[in-house]
Structures are given as C-alpha cells and as structure tokens.
Amino acid sequence: LAALVAVQPDAALAQIKKTGASAKKEDVNRRRDDGSTPLMLAVYNGDVAEAKRLLRAGADVKITSKYGATAMGLAAETGNTEMIRVLLEVGADPDSPNPDGMTALQAVARTGNVDAAEALLRAGAAVDAKEKFGGQTALMWASARRHPEMMRLLIAKGADVNAASTDRNYQRHVTAEGRPKSLDSGGLTPLLYAARENCSACAMVLLENRADIDLPDPDGVSPLLVAIMNANWDLARQFIEAGADVNHWDIYGETPLTTAIDLRNRIDGGHASIDPLNKATGLAIVKLLLERGANPNMQFFFKPANVRGAMTTRGVTPLIRAVFNNDSEVVKLLLEKGADATIYTADRQTPIHAAIAGRAPEPQAIELIKLLQKAGTDVNVIALVNHPEEIRGGTALHYAVRKREKEVIKLLVSFGVDMNAVDQDGLTALDYTQSRGFMPFMALQTPLYKDEAALLRELGATRLMDKSPTWPVLGPPQGIWEDIWPLGESAVHEPVYKHD
C-alpha cells in the first residue's frame, strides 16, 4: 500500500476507503462471546439514535445470539415503541420468537405498552401465538400482568378469550414417593389468570367479551374458586353476579361455599392478604352463594391438596368445616339453609366430633353441640381410626375425655351418649382416663385423668378393658389402605358422595 501511495495516490485512497468501508460494515455486526451484536446492545440500552446509526451502517437486524435473542425481542421486552418501529422499518420479523417460542407481541403484552403492541400487530404479528413451555398467549400474559387496556386491544384483534395454557399433566404420584405433589399443572385461561392476580378490571374485559366464566383449570378449579381462595370477596361477588356456577367443584369436591367458609375464618393462616378496599365480606359471600343455590351438603371426594389441618378428609361438608372453625354465625346460617347435621365423613366423624376436636373453647363448643344435637346429629356415632389425620376415633365422649372438657362430658351424657361404647382400639372413654389410650400426634400414651375418671364414674360409666393394651413404641400400626381410606358401606353414611 505504501508503494501504491507513492506511485498512484488516488488509487491508494480509493483502496483505503474501500477497505475501511468493508471493515466498518463487518464491525457493526461483530459478535461478542454470547453472540450478541452492537445493535442488540443499543436496543437493550434503549439508544434509538445509536441503533439507527448502526442500521445505516449495515447492521443486520435478523442476527440471533447464542441464546436466541434478537434485536426485536430485546426491544419488545422493554416495550420501546420507537425502537420497535425503527426495527420493523428495516425488515425485522414482527414475531421474532425466542428459542422458547415467546414472540415479540407476548413480551410487549407483559409491559402493557399498547402503542408498541399496535405497531407489531399492524406489521402482522400473530395475536394467538403460544410460547412452547407454558403454551401462553399474549392475552394470557396481559391478564397475568394486570393490563386491561392491552387485553382490549388483543381481543379486538381476534385473541381467543378462552384459550388455555399447556396442561402439563404432571404425574401426581411416583413409586418411591407416594405423597401427592403440589405442582403447577398449567391449563389456565386468561380469566383464571385475572382471578389469580386479583385483577377485577381484567376480569370485566374478558366477561364483556364472552369469556366462559366457569372454564376451569385441569384440577377443576374455576375462576370463582380462585377468587375465593384469594379472599378477594369483591371479585367473587362480581363472578357470582355475572352467573358463575356456585356449585362447580374441583377434583377433590371442594366448592366455592366450603372455601369461602374456610377463608372467612381460617384458623391455620397461609391465605392471601385481603385487600383493605374490599367492600364485600366473607360472610356476605357465604350468604350470596347460598341465596344463589349453593349446595350446603356438598362433600369432599378426597382430602384436598391445598387444604391443611384436621377435618379435611373425605366426606367433609361445609357444616363440618364451619363447626371446626368455630364459626357459629355460619353454622346457624347453614342450618337455616338446609344443611344436614346427620351427615358424617368417610371416617364417621360427625359435626359434633368437629365441635369438640376443633378450635372452639369449651363454652363455644357447648353452644355448637347444642345447636347440632337439636338439628339431629347423633352423639353415639363411633368415628373410625384415621391414620393420616392421626385420629383414634370413638364417640363424641371419647373426644371430650381426650380434651378433658368436663362440661362437654356432662352435656353429652345428658344427650344420651353411650358411656360404655368402645372405639376401634377396644377402649371406652373411661379407659382413656386410665392412661390406656394412645396419642398419635405425640407418640405417647394418654396420661392419667383422675378428675375425668371420677366424673365419668359419678355419671354412670362402668366398663373398663380387662387389661391395658401394650402399644408399640411408635404407636399402632398404620394399617392397610382400606383402613386409611375406608370405602365399605359400614364406613360411609348413606348421603356421602351424593352430589347435586
């Protein structure tokens, strides 16, 4: 080149310009270690002027990094309308899916930038494209991120309001680990996302555009049930008044009524924080559900995976849950609306068992027992052993003795409880006062209850086992599957599992 400059300076200059231009063109598309380009960096930083300069210099808008990122995808993630328009003008793909299939429109939908979404849609972006992992659409993303105006735009452009994300259908049990798995199963609709995120405005947009109000997830959970699970009473009222099925149950048999009863007066915590702006109350929703025809005698098919604590076994009714929660107001309401106080669970626990085993202090338990006995609950039903719940069963008297509630004992005797009835371990209530029972939750034998023993004998109890049982160190054996989940007619009250 130096020799050429000395002999033909004009030719040398031309060659320098040509080489420089070539170098410059190659430079604007140079790759970093991750495969990204200067254009991608400019887009990521929102530097429109730099992006335009690079594009004029020949930057390739369609280059993909090693991780599948594109300039358009990066612009969409930030919802940069001007940048998106610049890229579209030079031929960028309006969909620009990443390796997971997420499109630019889906990314923009998450930001809520309606202008950016309009630009992509005008350029031909697919409104109902689904990403590969979750099968979610732009409308689902907009609903999940609480962007009702974005949802209006997408629906106006033809988005499917009833589309569902991928049902992953995870295996719920494996050979080596038999407990139920709490896994995100997918299968959510835009309305389910709105309910999950407590977005009333999003729900209204969908309902105005004829979204199916009862379309559930793969576990049978409806939008109404989700709203109640979140203790979002206002949204629950909105769904009920819009015509939601108040008797829609999930795969466990859990209904909006049972869930509302639990969440209005939940004893074990763990539920969503209640919006202080909620105008409706849990009690108002319970009343509204009953007014709209909710079945007060609906029972659990199985113990729900998302409900903790005792009295959550098969056959549990709304009444039993309300009693266990010491919610006398709802108990009275349910009885007025036709709740059957004679129905018991698959392990034969009655509402009176629930009153004693629940969280009610003794005075409140007594009031509940009086209500239930008047409504027909039999004090002599013998509950069965339930291993998962760590319950040894027995009559209501067995339960009262184990809790050492003397006034409850007197009340039950006045109601005609059989003082000499035996539980499945062959023990009477009097046996329990003699340290012959077993407390599974503590893995200990029951202590000696002298005062309760004296009271029972005074009231007429006479029967004792001939000899105290010898319990294994860890307590009674766990039993076979039929013992754990009793299925026989002898274990199931006739009305159990009859669902309207």
Role assignments for model-derived ranges:
Residues 22-26, 52-60, 85-93, 118-126, ...:
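Ankyrin repeat domain, specifically the short helix-to-loop turn at the C-terminus of the second helix
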